[in-house]
Amino acid sequence: MINSSIITYCQFLFMSISLISMLTGEVFPVTDIMINGDQDSRVNIVFLGDGYTQEEMNDYIDDVGEVVEGLFSAVPYSNYINHFNVFAIEVPSNESGTDHPGTAYDCGGDAGNVFYADTYFNSTFDYYGIHRLLVPLNTSAAYDVLIDNTPQWDIVFLMVNTTIYGGSGGAFATFSRNAASTEIAVHELGHSFAGLADEYWYSGWETANMTQESNPLLNKWNPWLYDNNIGIYQYEDPGYNWYRPHQNCKMRYLGPPFCSVCAEQTIKSVYSILDLIDSYFPENLELTVPVFGTEYFSINPILNIPNSITIDWFIDEQPMLQGSTNLELEASLYSEGEHEVKVVVKDLSDLVRNDPLNLLESEVIWNMTIECNAEGDLNMDGMVNIQDVILLVNNVIGISADVTCADLNSDGEINIQDIIILVNIILGN
């Protein structure tokens, strides 16, 4: 008869192995396409490929490169390329291609072109009965791959290995390898990243570029009205009570650039993830500085193209320096005690006019304490002696100017009591 403790141990071992198996995901090769900084300080774009076999991985990486080149040639992404990293996860499918069940009402010439492929993310056309709506059905597999390989993703492109036109927004900006693939990708990114609506009629909801408010004074893109052809344009029927800001935007047609409203929303989406300041020094925001010491402050902002970043330094809310990433502070120029050093960084891009949340502004504040570190050495010659007494006496009787670190009893006054304390220090009392 088998010992019950052995059975219990085996059951525990089996459960442990099963748990480890469930928690251990599959790791795939990840190619760095474009790296501009640490993943925790950039918008991280991750590409997933569906319908690429292992033998087609080189084609997949080439396809990713073409899309990335096109994306960062488009305004405003071209202006903010320094704010992004791009990675491509190499996930092979068993078969090349995707699914087209031929079930959509608008398949047209592709109605009889029915095919299926065994792909990793099970992408398919004809979703919701719309031929061009190309989606990955196995989204849980996509999330697993992202978590196991690039857990700090912000944007996901899912590129499907077929030349038939199609794509979709949502959590994953999905598109095919059609001749218009880059345009499709950038358009779908408008949905999945910037939360933009289509500017052709699909359905209505309030977004940065879609509204039911036709009053110019109340309209959300009021700061742009009548510039760059921005207006309040009615959607076609049945969306006659909804309005878009432009008649020829990338969110309506492939080919044109983003309108001013959509470009602005894209930039604000970047800054909803990132801080303008990449890093700063000192990293410790609570500082103690000797009264005759020098403290160095610096920041590393993420610059856009062309650069529209401004930098302003303040000490105790008083302007000190503009335009520099560095500040050298001589503590002797300030009183003993608490001081605030602040740097304010702003992006004054003319592509943004409406920023009520101040997303295009960032600051760092250091709390600095200036204190004496050599009690009694008033002339800072490294010794406490009669010369310091003479200096203090002259100050008390009004012959010389104020002396730093002379308030030896910290009562807020420099007087005979401080002279007595200084003499006692010299005498060793």
Positions of the model-derived regions?
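Propeptide-to-catalytic entry region of secreted or membrane-anchored zinc metalloproteases
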Residues: 26-145, 351
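Short pre-active-site segment immediately N-terminal to the catalytic Zn-binding motif
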Residues: 57-60, 165-186
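Catalytic zinc-binding patch centered on the HExxH motif and its immediate surroundings
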Residues: 97-100, 139-175
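Active-site recognition of the HExxH zinc-binding catalytic motif
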Residues: 182-199
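Low-complexity, Pro/Thr/Ser/Gly/Ala-rich linker/spacer regions in secreted
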Residues: 23-27, 275-280, 340, 363-377, ...
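Cellulosome-associated attachment modules in secreted, modular CAZymes
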Residues: 371-429
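Bacterial N-terminal signal peptides
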Residues: 11-21
